[in-house]
Amino acid sequence: MISMHASAVCRVVDGYTGKPLEGSALSCTLDGVFCRPVAKQGGYLVLLNLSPGRHRLALCCRGYQEEWVEFQADGGTRELDITMKPGAGYPFRQTITRLELTVEAAGHPAAGRQLWLAPSGLFELKLAQTKAEAGEEQLRLYCKGPEETAPMGAYLIADGTNSEIVGLRSFEREMGMLTTPLRHAHSRGKLLLPAQRYHTGPDGKLAAVFRAACTVEVYAEEAGLLASLKLEEGENRQTIPL
């Protein structure tokens, strides 16, 4: 009997609307080879029986930028959130705020770097307990508005040198469950900002779109908080160093 193991479960959403993208609309490659993950309703893709080690999943879809994620297969089941960013031909229905961000390292384009962008003002979600210690996976959170307005997925805890990316797995009755334990301690009132992962191209640039003028926090896993960018409605061009 053939045993089937879910090595990775990917939740794919439209990074602009937050709505799920169904697997039938996506073209997928795994480690450079075309593949057909098992597609489940609600924007889920399931990768089965992966060999142990590092893998790279790349997704393409009409109207979106190519997106990719690297992950480690270790015998368990990895949970991955993938946001597809609007690209050429995306059907915007209102005025938008665009950002073209150039990232430099030692005065040269920083190609192939992974950054997280986290806009403020979409909704208010913050830590509601006196202190959350490193290693905790369950947090008491305050959401200004209905809890269902806070989507599951990646968030930036904006906390100076202790800033970090966390994954919100569930949120009910003021209790949020994370996908992995906290790496740092955080005190009451620290904001959780919805975050999306971006990659710079060969020219060190990335493109992002937001619904309205906002302030965007820029974070890199290896460097922490890099910048806080105030964006105006329309076109914005910024350059930051790593």
PLM segments and residue spans:
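A short, solvent-exposed loop/turn motif at the edges and junctions
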Residues: Y44-G76, T161, T215-N236
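Structural motif
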Residues: I2-G23, F92-W116, S120, F210-A212
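Conserved, compact domain cores that house catalytic/ligand-binding motifs in diverse enzymes
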Residues: T102-K126, Y198-L225
